């Protein structure tokens, strides 16, 4: 059968050849490592800006008010709140889309595959919160127990990318699955424990919008515009309700259909393509494009649109808006003895390393799950330590947990210090112990070869 090679891009070529991006650069930008580098650069820029002679402009800029109004209704927030309440809804929508896809068609369908990272994530949620609460048992400081409960997936996967082939693929899968379960826990904490002053009207409108999205699913609506319009209404309703508006992104991500297309939908595409080949006109082009799009779940198409925006725009801007901690001598001396700073740092480093590794080993030893492939206990410990890099969601919860700016500054210093130590310690553990400890689940990656049927005879020697 003759294979047809598709052109690199559809449509006629340009008359003027534009410079092409190197394949290595394209591959880098397509990975989590690219987003992690941008986030790191944004955080460094925020720190330099906040500690420069122009530090006052940092606070003034993010305190600038921006208004979005339609008639008598509208939203009036500072740029800082637009980033945290508005733009971050896109980030959480991507998280919800990934969770929904993994549960529908991905790795989260297999109980034994998800058991180890799921139990590890639970350990990584409970122990850090417990360590922080032991250090801060009372007063407004105790509200920060949710800060060290999250893992920054972009940073962790970015660090693993530096190891290249030496890092088992199954370890990346373990961390991605752990991050998904971890995000579910962090989102639940935000929705339940960091919400107050509920508005019944806003909740009612939000509930009706969720029902409308479910109705779109039931009707098998595959086009994206109805879901996007409902998402905007849901965001506004949840923002008015008093629940943190980013929950709208999570709900939309979970509700957008991720079910693979039916066989008859795929079989329809060649029909429209043949009709287009017979007579190329705008109507038939539209039908062929629509038929092709209908074969891709709405979840995948929306994620393809939102993921680059989230990784390369939203998250770096969030880092720029929230990582600007004042690191003068007075602030560092206060942080060195602050129970908030010490509690956050200790919980991120020790809580995640111990909680995830102990729970993961327990799941393996009890037979609840397995870590197949070349994953060793040294890899598990190193990955658990890297999971202590809690940047994006930790900074996000800090803004919700504390109203006192001094406590926010102390928590952010703890996040920066704890994440830095966790990154260095995890990298060292992976390099030193990664290949020197036993396999977590030996003989589970490949089936054991069967013996040939009896009678067994020695091969006849050649004459």
Curated annotation (Swiss-Prot):
Recorded hits in InterPro entries, A to Z, give: Na/H_antiporter_dom_sf, NhaA
> What are the protein's UniProt keywords?
Antiport, Cell membrane, Ion transport, Membrane, Sodium, Sodium transport, Transmembrane, Transmembrane helix, Transport
The principal localisation class reads membrane
Gene Ontology, cellular component aspect: plasma membrane
Renumbered to this chain, region (Disordered) spans 444-463
Q: What does this protein do?
A: Na(+)/H(+) antiporter that extrudes sodium in exchange for external protons.
Q: What is this protein called?
A: Na(+)/H(+) antiporter NhaA 3
Could you tell me which species this protein originates from?
A: Frankia alni (strain DSM 45986 / CECT 9034 / ACN14a)
For this protein's source organism, the top of the classification is:
Bacteria, Bacillati, Actinomycetota, Actinomycetes, Frankiales
